[in-house]
Regions:
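N-terminal, polar/charged subdomain of small-to-medium soluble alpha/beta proteins
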Residues: 1-96, 110-114, 118-155
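Short glycine-rich or small-residue beta-strand-to-loop segments that form or flank ligand, phosphate
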Residues: 96-103
């Protein structure tokens, strides 16, 4: 059975439980479902955050995420894959991103989800701006995020 990833880039929030259920309900070939949901924090380094604004390059973002989803599907035996990433102004407590992987066994589901999140955190064409009492500032990837993503590079 050929698996196609579900990829959505949207402004609206999403229901994590509903997305997980949609991927796994009634499936007898799925033995493991792993999900990661990224949520907007209300503070960074002790400083309150009013909101995040995520910008993306339409078309390019979908294509790049699709390319990495295809790589995950070729590297791990997945029965299902959903990636949702929001853009626009996001308030603390709201969802930002969701990755759900389904496989017959847990190792493939965990590794594929981690691979995809490491990519999304470091190289996906999204730009994040924090709003705080001090003003706005662009958020850069951290060194530890780059190191996590580098471990998936094929030699």
């Amino acid at each position: 059975m050929s698996v196609t990833a579900t990829i959505r880039i949207q402004q609206a929030d999403f229901d994590v439980a509903q997305e997980i259920a949609a991927l796994s309900k009634g499936r007898t070939d799925v033995g493991a479902v792993v999900s990661f949901s990224g949520i907007c924090r209300g503070s960074e380094n002790g400083e309150p955050i009013a909101a995040l604004t995520l910008e993306h390059y339409p078309g390019m973002a979908e294509a790049e995420i699709g390319r990495h989803a295809d790589e995950a599907l070729s590297r791990w035996p997945l029965q299902g894959l959903t990636i949702i990433h929001r853009f626009g102004r996001i308030a603390p407590g709201e969802n930002i991103v969701l990755v759900v992987t389904a496989s017959a066994h847990r190792q493939a589901a965990f590794e594929a989800a981690e691979f995809l999140m490491d990519y999304l955190k470091t190289n996906a064409p999204f730009w994040k701006r924090e709003e705080s009492e001090k003003g706005t500032s662009w958020v850069e990837a951290h060194d530890h995020d780059d190191a996590a993503a580098a471990r998936w590079t094929k030699s």
